[in-house]
Amino acid sequence: MKILHVTPHLGGGVGKAHAAIAAAMPKDVHQTFLLLEAPRDRRHADALAAGGATVAVAETLDDVARQAAEADIVQFEFWNHPRLFECLARTGFPVLRSVFWSHISGLFRPLIPPRLVAAADRFVFTTDASLALPGLGAARVAVVNSGFGFAAPPRAQRDTPRIAYLGTVDPVKMHPGFFDAIDALEDDCQVSIWGAPSIHALKAALGMRHARRIGLFGETDRPQDALTQADIFFYPLQPEHYGTAENALVEAMSIGLVPVVLDNPAEATIVRHGETGLVARAIEDCPALLRTLMTDKALRERLSANAAAHIAATRTPARSADAFVALWRGLLAQAPQRPDFAAAVGATPADWFLATQGATWSPPLVPDLTAAKGTLTHFQHVFDGDASLERLRAAS
């Protein structure tokens, strides 16, 4: 069975997930990963190639069409990347069987165009929370997890617990009240933050009354080593964040860190309040929950053991590999068809950007001048000089 994965790149969580899943695939599955841009980080691409997969960069959109014609299944690794939307809109695809694996939840911006879900033969989410989206056809959609834990067994809780956060250190994802919550703790504590901090996060940390509680350690390529230094994983994310599988949360739980999260959809599908961690309704509730954990070692030990066992039982590469193989084999019985993805996403770069913003999008009062993924600036960076995007920018 020949599977062609069309993806903007293999960086971050997408590449990490595929490297893990590919190692659990049966021998009769051959995977080709066709990248739409040259990779900047080759770690996961090299791991896939070393395991027997083919990894290549598309020369042209005609190259994408040619390789799609040779595959049994074409799987699009979906998120709001400009190059992927260009590929969907401008490639002259042959008849094919299409699967989309969405690495965004679609619950908040960036949204998933409903017509794209309808155009796909199968549309796969990475979180059960996405099944709440309106208008989904049950026969077309599925959920396959992309976040996996570490194999190492959990270690014992310390008498004096330490707190950690690992991930995006920016209010685009981290809740802006994170530092206020740490400041509000009655007891002193040590909090290690792993991830490159934004200017907003740095200002918030420096403005704390108890700034010495915070340690900013930057990015790490050894997350397991970073996490094993802590006992509690404080992971409050802003309510409309774009995350789905939450790899850092899953990894932390797998080695026994007790999570404290907000009741956002993605996190609430991973953490069970009072069983595998603690779930707060609001950021203001977090200091009390943290203090409860810090002062009750028996509770920490129970939740720690439950968290590790839950991840080991439910979130493994083998389970995801089996789920995909079953989905692909089921789709082989269906005759290939010529897709019209352009009708679902639009014809111009401005159409593609707006397709992920919803009907109520309006230009921001303060334009985002950074090329953060999926932003208007990102689209302009990729399609420099495009008239449709310039009109959108002028409106802001």
Task: Give the residues covered by each predicted segment.
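Conserved donor-binding/catalytic core segment of Leloir-type glycosyltransferases
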Residues: 4-6, 152-173, 179-186, 192
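Conserved acidic donor-binding segment of nucleotide-sugar-dependent glycosyltransferases
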Residues: 273-274, 278-284, 292-297
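Nucleotide-activated donor-binding/catalytic signature segment of Leloir-type glycosyltransferases, i.e.
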Residues: 50, 202-220
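Nucleotide-sugar-dependent
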Residues: 236-250, 262-264, 268-269
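Short hydrophobic beta-strand element within catalytic cores of glycosyltransferases
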Residues: 34-35, 257-262
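Donor nucleotide-sugar binding/catalytic pocket of nucleotide-sugar-dependent glycosyltransferases
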Residues: 119-153
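C-terminal amphipathic helix plus adjacent low-complexity
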Residues: 313, 318-396
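Glycosyltransferase donor-sugar binding loop
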Residues: 33-41, 190-203
